[in-house]
Amino acid sequence: RGLGDVYKRQDNITSVTVEKNGEREKIPCSACVLATGQGARDTYHILYDIGLELLPKAFAVGVRIEHPRELIDRSQYGEFASHPRLGAAEYHLADKAGNRGVYSFCMCPGGVVVASSSGPEQVVTNGMSRHARDEQNSNAAIVVQVDSRDYTVGPLGGLDFQEQIERAAYYAGGGDFTAPAERVGDFLRKAAPKAFGSVKPTYRPGVCRSNLYQCLPDFVSEGIRAGITAFGRRLKGFDMDDAVITAVESRTSSPVRIQRDEEGCATRMKGLYPVGEGAGYAGGIVSAAVDGICLLYTSPSPRDMRR
């Protein structure tokens, strides 16, 4: 179901309308936990239109990078790589590119790059590892910090920024949800993209060899370039020519925060409890779950729901 409308009387929630398969249902309520994901962009617009306090929030965008799993294992484990008691190796990397942070995010050892679009004319990447973590490649997002100086003024400006680069990636990939990708060596040298080498991209439905500078803002491209170079000095082989980068990773966290009061209510609507990633208070599955649990045990109305 999707959120249709939210109704209030004297700043207290009275009902919500939800939509499913084109049908609308109005549900009376005095308390509602709003636990959307950050991809529910229409919800932000609904809340903005009814006067809720929304604030822009820093986030990060970039690309997915893929290396051979065995290379990352050797770089991290050394002589113990491939030991049966050790799983696929992980890494966590961070550096500065000028006055911005650049870092790895959501590292997926022995995993694949997956499509994560939530609407038309978008290419959005993510990563996942299956239980065995035994795929040929390991991948992670390499992202650069973005804040309100980088996009149009207003609480929803970050959404517009995300949509612009997602649309650029969509068309750079050919307009059929194929993702633009290139070898790291070509990206670092700003050379024309060559055929993929020893590392094969795993994104489905597939990739299109592209110059990623054409679908990323300059400060993001240069930040990624500086970051990969720095990470190559710390993790042997990280900047290998045949590593593959695929655009774009744009959903690291919400660019919007729904303001809450000390009881967890939306500041301009009593009884509406925004929680988790979509509300701007979490940056992943576990932190979103923790935010929901904290709300349940600390806020008056959700506490009553436990009965």
Region annotations inferred by a language model:
Residues 2-7, 297-307:
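Single conserved hydrophobic/aromatic residue that forms the stacking wall/gate
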Residues 8-25:
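Conserved beta-strand-loop-beta-strand element in the redox core of flavoprotein oxidoreductases
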Residues 27-37:
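Short hydrophobic core segments
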Residues 39-49:
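Flavin (primarily FAD) binding-site architecture
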Residues 56-146:
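Mid-to-C-terminal "cap/lid" subdomains and adjacent gly/pro-rich loops that border
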Residues 124-213:
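C-terminal catalytic lobe of FAD-dependent flavoproteins
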Residues 210-276, 289:
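A glycine-rich dinucleotide-binding beta-alpha-beta segment and adjacent secondary-structure elements
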Residues 280-296:
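A conserved FAD-binding loop/helix module that cradles the flavin
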